[in-house]
Amino acid sequence: MNTEPIYIVKSDGTREIFDIKKLEFSLKRAGASSAVTDGIVSTITDSLTDGMTTHDIYTRAFELLHTDEHPVALKYSLKRAIMELGPSGFPFEDYVAEIFKYKGFETLTGQVVKGKFVEHEIDVVAWNDEKLIMVEAKFHNQLGVKSDLKIALYVKERFDDLSEQTFHYGKDRKLDEGWLVTNTKFTTTAIEYGSHQGKRLVMIGWNYPEHGSLHDMILEAKLHPLTCLTTLDGRQKKTLLEQGIVLCKTLVERPELLVGLGLPSETIAKVTEEIQAL
């Protein structure tokens, strides 16, 4: 690779110097072995050219991982798989609800609740014996799009209107926490604002906060979206999403869903094998 700095183009159109450590980190975080990571990094850096896009780099890394460590490739593609839950955003709400279920909460989606002044439609309501959480699930289906200060302010105002109301979820109670969950990033001003709001605005982005981000939660819970699978095509995934099915593990627990797609037994076996390898 040329010793001169090489600039790559990010998904938002901005240019930055290629950082080999970012590529290494993303591969290792997905679970790639040191040997595979070193091999992929070497292959990509040898072919790197000025102006190459992050999408090009990701695609090549995914192809190499798919060959060397297929289950790792599925984890590496996680961010894009979440984006494929769209475009409506409703499957993302279901997906966020599944994360809360894993954490021991009961959940409902698409709830209309009465605030002090107006009614609000809440994407996810989650509760257990200890707390009641209401969630705004902000879905973006394009890389490079961030949730900005305007979104954070809007969501905080909604939670403020709900803060003194009594709700019946499990028992009569008031709202304990308001969450803003997005599948991409927050702008720096949104993060600065949110950092001063306490439990009134808990902000969860793809890689924010440093510990406990959406990506961390997904890996901890092993709740891989069915959109990460390579053994199903786009039409088949869309059919399942329209039925409210968002998780790989649901397809193993309910094999009749795959039968309902009209898949032959050989394909069903391949899908199941791919899921179990995750």
Please report, for each region that a protein language model flagged, where it lies by residue.
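Compact, charge-rich alpha-helical regulatory domains located at protein termini
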Residues: 216-278
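Intrinsically disordered, low-complexity Ser/Thr/Pro/Gly-rich regulatory segments
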Residues: 34, 61, 65-224, 241-242
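Short leucine-rich amphipathic alpha-helices used at interfaces
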Residues: 2, 7-9, 13-16, 207-208, ...
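Long, C-terminal-biased catalytic regions of enzyme "large/alpha" subunits
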Residues: 1-85, 92
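Residues that form generic nucleotide/phosphate-binding pockets
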Residues: 26, 47, 64, 158, ...
